[in-house]
Amino acid sequence: MTIVEDPEGNETSTLHAMVDFKNRRILEVGCGEGRLTWRYANKAAHVTAIDPMAEDIETARANLPDRLKGRVSFAESTIEDFARSMPERKFDIAIFAWSL
């Protein structure tokens, strides 16, 4: 069975109506396989997407469109470990989609 997420674009249009991603540094917590990442990364200056599941991060990296390479980086990490390892990092926007 194939699952199509957001087939009508409601999630994507709502996200873009609420947030201006243009030239912003984004932290996406709980990125999973990157299903949301691709929907806004083309407008952001850079996206750091983290998830504690190694398999999901591997899938997200493997499926990263060529046009977004260099604009998106992935890390296998919890938010707590990420914050401890990089306390100096600054972001304009943090997204917690499907992660709470």
Question: At which residue positions do the language-model features occur?
Answer:
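Conserved alpha-helix/loop element of class I SAM-dependent methyltransferases that forms part
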Residues: 5-24
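Local beta-strand N-terminus motif with an aromatic residue
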Residues: 23, 91-92
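Conserved class I S-adenosyl-L-methionine
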Residues: 24-32
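Class I SAM-dependent methyltransferase SAM/SAH-binding core
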Residues: 35-82
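Short amphipathic alpha-helix with an adjacent loop that forms part of the alpha/beta core around
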Residues: 81-89
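A conserved beta-strand element that flanks and buttresses the S-adenosyl-L-methionine
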Residues: 95
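Short catalytic micro-motifs in class I SAM-dependent methyltransferases
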Residues: 98-99
